[in-house]
Amino acid sequence: MSLMQFSGLLVVWLLSTLFIATLTWFEFRRVRFNFNVFFSLLFLLTFFFGFPLTSVLVFRFDVGVAPPEILLQALLSAACFYAVYYVTYKTRLRKRVTDVPRKPLFTMNRVETHLTWVMLMGIALVSVGIFFMHNGFLLFRLHSYSQIFSSEVSGVALKRFFYFFIPAMLVIYFLRQDSKAWLFFLVSTVAFGLLTYMIVGGTRANIIIAFAIFLFIGIIRGWISLWMLVAAGVLGIVGMFWLALKRYGLNVSGDEAFYTFLYLTRDTFSPWENLALLLQNYDNIDFQGLAPIVRDFYVFIPSWLWPGRPGIVLNSANYFTWEVLNNHSGLAISPTLIGSLVVMGGALFIPLGAVAVGLIIKWFDWLYELGNRETNRYKAAILHSFCFGAIFNMIVLAREGLDSFVSRVVFFLVIFGACLLVAKLLFWLFDCAGLVHQRAKPQPQTQVEG
């Protein structure tokens, strides 16, 4: 890459970043937080944060990358995607009405809410316990990270239930919403994340999500300022780099440490070059249509329920890894949101996907606003826990693609909804048995004048 080509890419990157950052800043000033703000920051991180890292790798360490014209296409496609997404998100097809009372779809009481978070936490802890009994601490047993996907590890499906610990802790926080509950959320979820990191063998998702939710709650409540958020972000990047070194068993120093930091940070937070690789091999892609979305549900179907279930699921990530990169190491490499759309239907699917994502984020913001307006604090805690608990799925959306997001958000909805239904059933049984008692309201103290 010549300096002239880099200069052209830099101009496009600066304009695109300024465009998205400006819209995000205006939205932040207006509402302080909603899921449009979160997705916009996540989109910036995924598709634009990595450009400076790539530039240093190219000019400092002479690392090979895709041709400049392909990198330009990747930057422009990301900017155009966001423009279509933003217009979709902001467009209203009918007048907003907030004063018309509507019959609530469901309601919650104190006992049902506590039963819900206990079951969510129980699902996570029991799954971790069973996985640990089968495999022990994989971080200290396995020699390479790719081994966690091998036949040496049993009970892999249980990992999908670990994440429900976070929504359980979110319910506890939203019932109190004070600084002590906020700090308790951080300590409990990060401790659980570190435990699963050691048990699973290097998976950092629970730690990243817990820390991100903690920061956004702090922003919403005014406990964290913007400069503190930036400082925490830098600390998070360094922390994730250290965990990555431990995960891959790397011992580096000097220039090698700087090089390792650059490419691991880029791959962890901003795999934008994967989109460029897909665009570089565009003519060789056999478009998969909507099949990757359907196939991604296969992993949630137990083999005893479907004996003939395919052992290999060809979703967009695996198609990118196996067919485009010809990588059969056992790891699935993230194609990114836009990359998954390219795999499914080429350039035509990019604006269609942007419209779909705009509607998805709008739906989450509708739920979030519903929780903000809710007068029943127990129902509000459940709604907010569901919305913030789905942040993990939004990160999957940006990094892994639309197919992975759809299957995971449906799975999350089913398990979360099942816990709500079971909680209501248990409350009904307890109530029928006379085990539920109303809390006595404290009597007002009367002051006796002497």
UniProtKB/Swiss-Prot annotation:
Domain of life the protein comes from: Bacteria
Gene name in the database record: wzyE
Segments passing through the bilayer: 6-26, 37-57, 63-83, 120-140, 155-175, 181-201, 207-227, 228-248, 341-361, 378-398, 410-430
Subcellular location as annotated: Cell inner membrane
Native organism taxonomy: Bacteria, Pseudomonadati, Pseudomonadota, Gammaproteobacteria, Enterobacterales
Topology term for the membrane: Multi-pass membrane protein
Keyword annotations from UniProtKB, A to Z: Cell inner membrane, Cell membrane, Membrane, Transmembrane, Transmembrane helix
Function: Probably involved in the polymerization of enterobacterial common antigen (ECA) trisaccharide repeat units.
Organism of this sequence: Citrobacter koseri (strain ATCC BAA-895 / CDC 4225-83 / SGSC4696)
Keyword Cell inner membrane attached: yes
Entry-linked InterPro entries: WzyE
Protein family (similarity comment): Belongs to the WzyE family.
GO (cellular component) term, any one: plasma membrane
Quaternary structure annotation from Swiss-Prot or TrEMBL: Probably part of a complex composed of WzxE, WzyE and WzzE.
GO terms under biological process: enterobacterial common antigen biosynthetic process
Pfam families in alphabetical order: WzyE
Record flagged with keyword Cell inner membrane: yes
Pathway(s) this gene product operates in, as recorded in its UniProt entry: Bacterial outer membrane biogenesis; enterobacterial common antigen biosynthesis
Protein name: Probable ECA polymerase
